[in-house]
Structures are given as structure tokens and as C-alpha cells.
Amino acid sequence: MICGIDEVGRGCIFGPILSAAVVFKKKPNFIKELDDSKKLTKEKREYLSSLILENSYYAFGEISNITIEKINIHNASLLAMQTAYENLKLNCNLVFIDGKFVPKISAKNVKAIIKGDSIIDEIKAASIIAKVKRDKLMDEYDKIYPLYLLKKNKGYPTKEHKNAIKKYGVLSLHRKNFKLI
């Protein structure tokens, strides 16, 4: 069994960092359509996400902005990946991680792959479902905090988002140790 893990939200100034772990039940017929989530349109990501969820074992790991502030974004990213793998509750022979650092994972063989979200199909799939899940979370927060344009910026430090912080203040879900806040 091969597992791919990726995270999303590392560069955000609002909300959690979210990670996904994916193991395909069998090689899916849509495998050639997979790519790094950042290279796909929103519509394509959502379409592929539903296919991935139907055809794989998957789990998520979510680390709050408060924990990010306590342990830093690097450690929070590793913890999110570790949590996603633990939540998967499978013993995988091989786990591919997007990036250059390996979280504490109890699998036999764990490999960090730089740009893995463009190379390894399981990481591509994890990238897609993590991005779709976090984007939907930001859409929900946008309903609560519409002045911060979270539906548009997804928690990233856009000019509009930074201007909203200056005008309306920092929210409890902002990452306060981020340099821009």
C-alpha cells in the first residue's frame, strides 16, 4: 500500500494548516488528470476531489492557528501530516511526503519528495483533497467574517486581506506571529 501526504495553508495568515493522506483502493482511471492542486482550476479540483474521495482511503490532519503560534509553522506542518497518517489507520509499506522533511510516521518506508505534488499520484491526490477541504472551510469563515474576503483570498496575505486587518483588526483565527500581523 502506497500513501501520499500533502499539506495546504502553510503560507496563510488565517486559519489552520490542513493535511491529507491518500491511499488509492486501486489505480483509478482518472490518474492522468491528477496534478498539483495549485495548477488546477477550482472546478477541476472539486471534480477530482469527489473522484478521489470515492476511490481511495483518506484522512485529514488539521492544526489550529493557536498551535501554529505555539510550535511554529514548520512543526505544525509536520504535525498535520503525522496526524493525517495516524487518522488513516492503515499500515502502509511506503509513504511519500511532499517536501523535504519527514514527519514522525510509523510506516516502514517514508520518503520526502521535493515537488512531490507534481510527481507522485498519491501526493497529487492528497494535495487536491486538502486544498478543496481548506477552501470550503475558508468559504464558511467568509460568511462569518465577510469584511476579510476569505472566500476570495482563502486566508493568504493578499493586499485586500492585509488592508482588512488594518481597517477592522486581527481576528482570533489570524496567525498572530506571522510577520504581516
From Swiss-Prot:
Coiled coil regions, renumbered to chain: none
Primary location class: cytoplasm
A Pfam family this chain is assigned to: RNase_HII
Domain called RNase H type-2: residue spans: 1-181
Entry binding sites for a divalent metal cation: D6, E7, D98
Role, per record: Endonuclease that specifically degrades the RNA of RNA-DNA hybrids.
Name of the protein this chain belongs to: Ribonuclease HII
Organism encoding this protein: Borreliella afzelii (strain PKo)
